[in-house]
Design a protein with these regions (language model features):
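Lipid deacylating catalytic domains
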Residues: 2-243
Length: 243
């Protein structure tokens, strides 16, 4: 009763594929992308340093390097990530159950498993809970960044649209897209329309996103080519949030 307005700003309502796939599959396993994409991404903004690392890594056999990365990812999850309920909260619902079987079934993980199971159930019911809040008069808004690829450290980095960190389906509560800078097929027909006002037009002028499939098309704002990290410095977004 005390909440009358909710503003989501690039929310991870269904986690981030970056986290989910690291838990479930480890790091990127494609040799070409490994050298050209992942290492520069891991080195951050210093691309030169990333490519210098690539030169050194190319001396190593591909199989050896992939084995090393698999071990690093496995140890990272087993020694640190599996104990963090915060990070478990960023595992998408589609990744949770197999990851739960992999890391949480030991008796020593019972306390953490209880908490992550609770969050997983809340995650699955997120859309229903938001719709219920709207029906009770709560105004819910969503700010979505899109058309920036996920960091190239997981195998499916190029399979979804994203803001660099969180995939579009999670931030937009279900908006459909084929991928970054990929137009919807000419024969595409939306099977979901969450806008009940026939006078509204939520079509993407670039034909990249079907906003009608998002849970709240009338109160969701999309920012093209906006990456996750610089959202806080976007004056338009900050003004929307504060008003």
């Amino acid at each position: 009763e005390d909440i009358n307005r909710i503003v989501y700003v690039i929310p991870a309502l269904d986690g981030s594929l970056l986290v989910g796939e690291i838990y479930q599959y480890g790091l990127l396993d494609d040799n070409i992308e490994l050298y050209s994409q992942m290492m520069p991404a891991l080195m951050g903004v210093d691309e030169m340093a990333g490519y210098l690392v690539n030169i050194v890594l190319r001396i190593m056999p591909n199989a050896d390097l992939n084995t090393i990365l698999d071990v690093v990812a496995f140890d990272l999850v087993n020694d640190y990530m599996k104990y963090s309920t915060l990070l478990w909260g960023l595992v998408p619902s589609g990744n949770y159950e197999p990851c739960r079987e992999m890391y949480l079934m030991d008796d020593s993980m019972a306390v953490i498993r209880e908490q992550t199971d609770w969050f997983y159930n809340a995650q699955k019911n997120s859309d229903a809970n938001i719709k219920e809040a709207v029906s009770q008069g709560v105004k819910v808004f969503d700010i979505v960044d899109y058309n920036v690829p996920l960091y190239e450290i997981i195998d499916s980095w190029d399979d979804v649209n994203a803001d660099g960190v969180i995939h579009l389906d999670s931030t937009s509560m279900g908006a459909y897209s084929v991928g970054v800078a990929k137009e919807l097929p000419k024969d595409y027909v939306s099977t979901v329309n969450n806008c009940t006002n026939p006078n509204h037009d939520h079509s993407d002028p670039r034909n990249i996103v079907d906003a009608n499939t998002g849970l709240l098309p009338c109160t969701t704002f999309y920012f093209y080519n906006q990456n996750h990290e610089s959202t806080g410095s976007n004056d338009v977004i900050m003004k929307l949030v504060s008003e």
